[in-house]
Amino acid sequence: MALRLILGFDYGTKQIGVAVGQVITGQARELCTLKAQNGVPDWNQVEALIKEWKPDAVVVGLPLNMDGTPSEMCARAEKFARRLNGRFNLPFYTHDERLTTFEAKGERLVRGGQKGSYRDNPVDAIAAALLLQGWLDENTALFES
């Protein structure tokens, strides 16, 4: 199956950032931030995104520790990826998301956003775009014919 469009997810227990990426252009951009209750999203909202964008696959960020070992959240992020696969029959990939939230906060400031609190100014969708962009950059060989 040729991959053309991919959704990226920055998984969190309170918020989940979502981004979209196109393989042909090799570019990713943020879409939205979904609310979550203890890591569980509103699956109806996720389904609406899947129906609207019709992705060929999903990429879920893995929150690894700085030394590359799995963090406590890695198992939850992987479970979320498996649930996406089970509910929507989409292949999934995972990608190291270290420092994407930090980078996303800087990106928000560059764009003229407010420093403010993380809760009031979420950067999850930007982080999702950064991790998806990283995945696209590292996996271009998969898409070349």
Curated annotation (Swiss-Prot):
Keyword tags: Cytoplasm, Hydrolase, Nuclease, Ribosome biogenesis
GO terms under biological process: rRNA 5'-end processing
EC number: 3.1.-.-
The organism's place on the tree of life at top rank: Bacteria
SMART domains in the cross-refs: YqgFc
GO molecular function: nuclease activity
HAMAP family listed in its UniProt record: Nuclease_YqgF
Species whose genome carries this gene: Pseudomonas fluorescens (strain Pf0-1)
Subcellular compartments: Cytoplasm
CDD domains tied to this protein: YqgF
Disulfide bonding pattern of the chain: none
Similarity comment: Belongs to the YqgF nuclease family.
Protein name: Putative pre-16S rRNA nuclease
InterPro entries, per the entry: RNaseH-like_sf, YqgF, YqgF/RNaseH-like_dom, YqgF/RNaseH-like_dom_sf
Major site of localization recorded for this protein: cytoplasm
Enzyme class per UniProt: hydrolase
An annotated GO cellular component: cytosol
SUPFAM superfamilies to which the protein is assigned, alphabetical: Ribonuclease H-like (SSF53098)
The keyword Lipid biosynthesis is assigned to this record: no
Record function comment: Could be a nuclease involved in processing of the 5'-end of pre-16S rRNA.
